[in-house]
Swiss-Prot record:
It is found in: Membrane. Residues 317-695 form the Protein kinase domain. The active site is at D477 (proton acceptor). Its EC number is 2.7.11.-. The keyword ATP-binding applies. It is a single-pass membrane protein. The lineage of its organism: Eukaryota, Amoebozoa, Evosea, Eumycetozoa, Dictyostelia. It comes from Dictyostelium discoideum (Social amoeba). Belongs to the protein kinase superfamily. ADCK protein kinase family. Residues 118-150 form a coiled coil. This is Probable serine/threonine-protein kinase abkD. Residues 120-139 have a biased composition (Low complexity). GO terms for cellular component: membrane. ATP binds at I323, A324, A325, A326, S327, L328, A329, Q330, V331, K345.
Amino acid sequence: MKILKFSLLSKLKHKDFIVTSFRNNIINSIKNNNTNNNGLLKFSNNKYNFLNNNNNNNNNNVNKINNVYYINNNFKNVMENKIKPSSIQFFSSLSNKYNLNSFTTTKPQPCQAKPPSSKQQQQQQQQQQQQQQQQQQQQSKKKTSKDRLRDILKKTVITPQEFLNVLQRFAKNYKKTIASILAAIALIIYSYETPDSYFGSMMNVIVRFYRAMKCATKIMINYKILSYTPEKSSEYLEKSKICHQESADLILDLCLTNGGLYIKAGQYIASLNHILPIQYTKTLSVLQDQAPWRDFYEVESVFLKDLGNAPNHYFSDFDRLPIAAASLAQVHRAITKEGEEVAVKVQYVDLQRNFDGDIFTHNVLLTLVNMAFPDFEFNWMAEEMKNVLIKELDFSQEADNAERAAQDLSSNNNAYIPKVFRPYSSKRILTTEFIHGCKINNVQAIRSMGLSEKTVSQRFMEIMCEQIFIHAFVHVDPHAGNVLVRQHPNHPNQPQIVLLDHGLYREYDEEFRLNFCNLYKNLVLCNNKKVEKYSKALGVQNWKLFSTMILMRNFEGSSVGLSNSISSEELEKLLSGAIERLKDINLLMKAMPRHLLLILRNNNLLRSINMELGSPVNRFSIMARYAAKGLNSNSSKNSGIIRLVKSVEEKVSLEVMLKGYELYYYFVNRILSILIRLHIINPEKLIKDQMKKLG
């Protein structure tokens, strides 16, 4: 097919005339004539050429025509009336000659450019996003803090239109929304009215956990803020006192609100008056016997579940109001049918139900403390606390402990254990003999009975040392609320110590008892080699740090082991060393055998009570004598004259040494008191404090 000459167009006289596209006709012609019509019509910028090409693929030809077809937008005035009849006849004859079908003059449709590919779109979007980010960064650099705050508020504040949209959505689904609210309210009421149910227990755990987390968060924030104040500055002391008091108030409120195991933890914190600031010990001391008490209907429910009848079935008189409320139970005064006055200890009805949740909360709190203060790592305490409390929640176990302790101390007239009434006792109810007396730390009440606090402290120390060093069956929770003082029934001018609450005891084997006796005796005598030997025998490798924890003084630098006071230099060295070696202390406590932890607890409580009584006795000398007595009691069992003679020799030498130390410190204290009276030494308060340091 020959190329048509463009001279045909010159015959058209109109300047703006454009030949209308033959696109459809050409496509049909090519489809009908695969071999004859070998031309391809191309239009470009008001020019069209017929190219001679071999067309073997119809689809390719169609695509080529679609791609090359183009009409310039500058020529939009192609009208059918602008074409002369002669021109129409010419093109129609041309169409017939080359089988181009009918010729129609229609208004041309504009062709659309090929849309960009997906990759190109992604690249364009990425470029736009990068440009937007760069613009935002440039704008944010120019913005002030007020502008940023204003932008945040604009994003967070709900506009009126958004509020209307929320109301509209609520109006559409108001039935479902109201039903959900009513269901939630009903679930809360059901949980409150039925605390023993599954939902009630879960709701109680969640609420108690929330209170504990809230309290812990506030305390950690307070101490974090305090840490930014220089310790040597004048304002640090004032801020620290305020921080201690606020934290103690928060803990007290948490313990009173949650009750149960939280009060138990608060009691232990209150006993650490030789370690913690006075704000803690003074604030939390009310938890020892002034915990919140429960309503009488809870007491009746426990009686009905455990014994089968109400209290009035077993007692002729039963006080509805408790005389004391402790961490795990409250005590009521009652009179049996036989006329005996008894104390009825009733466990809180929800204590066992909340036990697992409180232990879980305890674990979380220790984890948070470890995260906020990395030097503290006491997560291992949770499992030990759980094992101890499981035994303490069983009052039948407490009754067994009380009867065994009474048998061990039967030869000691200065100690008394109340008698247990088994018919009126169960796992959650314990009925014992009622004792009239005062708390051991109530100095005024002790003096009003005509007794001496020095004698009271000495009797108490001797009783506890007898349990530790001789019987190896130890009351490990002897805080002031569990120890009463009364006039001796046979000797009214002498005190008698009454031990209460025997739920937490620890029994030690004979090997441990002998090793601990040797350890304490050599601690007092400052025999380093033997202290190291018996510390390792007890399972403690770091014997120096262990000795410091027992004596609460720098053992390595102590010149005399019997001093009941501690110098300011020793105290400062002890505290600074404890702070620097806090991680070592944590590691030691973590690796220490668990039975030693309870001994340390007992030791701290003895120190605490001695301090509250004014440190009238030297507890080191008392404990050293009973340690030697415990060793002698073992040697007397063995048949051997040489062993007996050697033990007597050791006892005499120890007694001579103890008497010498006691006389030395007696004269030192007398001289100091005379200097104070003569006003030769002015800082009287400082001297007295040094004499009472660490009991």
